[in-house]
Amino acid sequence: KIGVKYKHFFIDEFQDTSILQWDNLIPLIENSLSSEESSLTISGDIKQAIYRWRGGEPEQLLNLCSNNSDFFIESNVIDLGTNYRSKDEIIKFNNSFFNHIGESVFTSLIHKNIYTNCIQQSNGDLGGYVGINILKPSEFVTKESAYNKRISGIIKDSLNNNYELKDICILVRTNNQGIEISDYLNSENIEIISSETLLMNKS
């Protein structure tokens, strides 16, 4: 009944959709698409598919753009060639980085094409900065302590270059990493706002 009620589906950030979630949606959408007045619009970026740990697979979005689609209708793929979100230097870095790993890391032709054909144009917003820090084994007491020390150093350098703490954001893979980094920065008298990690630490 739901497949009859809803005619148009729009799914944003599709790369975050798990296989289980998509398998549950397919019958509903397929039923709706049997009508000529229906449509399915999906937006996503395969390069941002970072949720393998909860069932997400980049191939899922790739298949929808190929002959392996779950549906009987032909897909119409629209590539957004201009990046309006990032500054020029970040876009240049992304183009160079993804092209490099596409050519040198992947052996599958399908995956090579994902990364080597993803060049984006700048929106004209000049500036931006990308830095990559590689830790040497000689810096390690433990991997975690080396990370914490380097993060603290980057923050202090940024403050010396007239940035403020409110300009700085740290992203981590796990909550435990967030708690550990928060504790270390507190010990360095670097003020932080991290309600989630602090709350988890107290629980």
Regions found by a protein language model. Name each.
Residues 1:
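Conserved helicase NTPase catalytic core signature
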Residues 4, 11, 15-203:
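Conserved motor-region signature of P-loop NTPase helicases/translocases
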